């Protein structure tokens, strides 16, 4: 047995499914998950000594690549001053200043420890601010594992095939209205059915938890208009897209102004950080200035703030997003060319530093129904054959891939060559 197999066997006796987050167990593709020893730049190294070109990037945070020296040094320096204080620090203020400068729609920001905390807290704030209970989310979109959001969710919940997770009371779920991504008519119908009861819409501006599905041109502006018409707040969940699709996020890329924004992943530079923020009048409703309660023992942790501050300063440098787009576009075009040569039906969606691979005869993939019609079994075979070639893709047909600026054009071309060999045998 390999070291990964031995570790997985031991882990399953101690951790549910052998992992601390379900998708890591390779549930969506089968087989034994890789146990990682270290990572550097664009590469992962498993405990058996094999190297992989990495397109998971810790599920999004590693936009600069693994083990970036600026982030590593910031963490070391911060750790020498102490690990946690439970009191305000200068770095929290500097981090808040930087985030609100980079994302102009955020007048104020509250730091938390995860994307789930960010979305959960933003929804509570929207409900408290509006005095309404119902929310709108979209099929196949994942916003963390809070009870009200595990309704027709994406990500690992989609892999498990559960429309709702057991343990979510029906009394909670009834306040979550699920509409179809990229379908404004379904959203209007929900508002017209409950015109005075909907507190907010929460949306991934690029749906990255049913693989990678960008919005149609009219979709996000249409959501903004409907929220204005019916007095609801628009929450844009940029946990995945923030600082990746564009420096100011997908909201800037697509030209839409939310009331609240949720951030995560890149904002922590690899440390556990989330954040939510937006309009000053809405944020003023948050404790301690307002009645909507939210708190966290480790929120604003000095190590995490130092890592995030270093990461965002690097991400804000000129050329970063142009490089991400160039590399991702080359990968997408190369995969399509290789698939066409082999006669393999394929769609590759991409925006900024995100991409999605779909085995389908359809000309495009634009919604949940399109995603669910794709050939998941073929993706499973593709995943394992690419893994054998030394390419680590997301181990699920429903998860986006992530590029970093540490990837070289040689890495991209090697990935395309590997895919060409795989398509020929697939």
From Swiss-Prot:
It catalyses: (S)-4-amino-5-oxopentanoate = 5-aminolevulinate. CDD domains: OAT_like. The modification N6-(pyridoxal phosphate)lysine is found at residue 265. The keyword Isomerase applies. PROSITE patterns: AA_TRANSFER_CLASS_3. Pfam families: Aminotran_3. Its main location: cytoplasm. Keywords: Cytoplasm, Isomerase, Porphyrin biosynthesis, Pyridoxal phosphate. InterPro entries: 4pyrrol_synth_GluAld_NH2Trfase, Aminotrans_3, Aminotrans_3_PPA_site, PyrdxlP-dep_Trfase, PyrdxlP-dep_Trfase_major, PyrdxlP-dep_Trfase_small. Its EC number is 5.4.3.8. Belongs to the class-III pyridoxal-phosphate-dependent aminotransferase family. HemL subfamily. HAMAP family: HemL_aminotrans_3 (MF_00375). This is Glutamate-1-semialdehyde 2,1-aminomutase. The gene is hemL.
